[in-house]
Regions:
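Sec-dependent N-terminal signal peptides
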Residues: 4-13
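Catalytic-site microenvironment of enzymes
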Residues: 4-5, 32, 255-258
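Generic marker of residues within folded, mature protein domains
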Residues: 13, 33, 60-62, 216, ...
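A periodicity- and composition-biased signal for non-globular, repetitive helical segments
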Residues: 8-9, 54, 217
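Penicillin-recognizing serine hydrolase domain
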Residues: 19-28, 94, 118-258
Length: 258
């Protein structure tokens, strides 16, 4: 396996990628391609992966359950950007909201989860996100919001990370079958409405999930897991100029490992 990886690495480092940052690395740490992987960049909605990880920590501690029912207040319903259609004070399971975060990048779901797990406080939840980041040894990752929304909406600084830290987040997520199950879904249904995955690469070149991200400052980001020849490869692209370019760049990284 080591010899195989070396050959591939030597080949793809001659290829040009247009993303601000690109990082292709196996779950075992074998690097296939690296560009600006240490440089800070806004996470955008990739922050939702940490949101889900924190919520699942509380589930695993038996503090909450995936079957717990959560209601939306008016403030949360009105969260801008990508969202699911919900009704005031209607109950939605925690499981369905976590799925909505990963599959459809629903900002209102992310804020509802944050308020529920944070016992009514978004700030408390974001501190849990940062506490987990520190515990994971992520020295270049800071969260200010539970969903990765831009300053123009939140009035907070941008959530930031770099490709190497995002690799660690993805590797951690790989150990949780719930995240892999949810992020691999091509669609979900919430309250009778169908929502199609934001990940248009699902099923191509071994793509089995994980999370896209976008706002006007971060541009188009993606944290992907591709199972290639039985090995999980984590491909990270940050700062692409369009959604289409993002998916092409991701496929190019995957193709050069397959």
């Amino acid at each position: 396996m080591k010899k195989y990886i070396l050959i591939i690495t030597m080949f793809i480092t001659t290829i040009s990628f247009t993303s601000f940052a690109s990082y292709s690395i196996s779950e075992y740490g074998d690097v296939f391609f690296e560009k600006n992987a240490d440089e800070l960049w806004p996470t955008a909605s990739i922050a939702k992966v940490m949101n889900v990880l924190v919520a699942l920590d509380e589930v695993d501690k038996n503090n909450i359950s995936l079957d717990d029912e959560i209601t939306f207040d008016r403030e949360t319903i009105d969260i801008k950007g990508s969202h699911i259609e919900v009704s005031l004070n209607k109950k939605y399971t925690l499981r369905s909201l976590l799925e909505a975060e990963l599959v459809y990048s629903a900002n209102n779901a992310a804020y509802a989860v944050a308020k529920y797990v944070g016992k009514g406080s978004i700030d408390n939840f974001v501190e849990l996100m940062n506490k987990k980041a520190r515990k994971m040894g992520l020295k270049n990752t800071v969260f200010y919001t539970p969903a990765g929304l831009p300053t123009s909406i939140t009035k907070m600084p941008l959530d930031v990370s770099n490709a190497k830290d995002l690799y660690q987040i993805a590797k951690y997520a790989l150990n949780d079958k719930r995240i892999l199950e949810w992020s691999s879904k091509k669609s979900i249904e919430v309250d009778g409405n169908k929502y199609i995955s934001r990940n248009k690469n699902l099923g191509f070149y071994g793509n089995i999930g994980l999370k896209t991200g976008f706002h006007s400052i971060s541009k188009f980001n993606m944290l992907a897991i591709n199972n290639i020849n039985g090995t999980n490869i984590i491909n990270i692209t940050l700062g692409d100029d369009s959604a289409n370019i993002r998916f092409i760049e991701q496929n190019n990284l995957a193709k050069n490992v397959s």
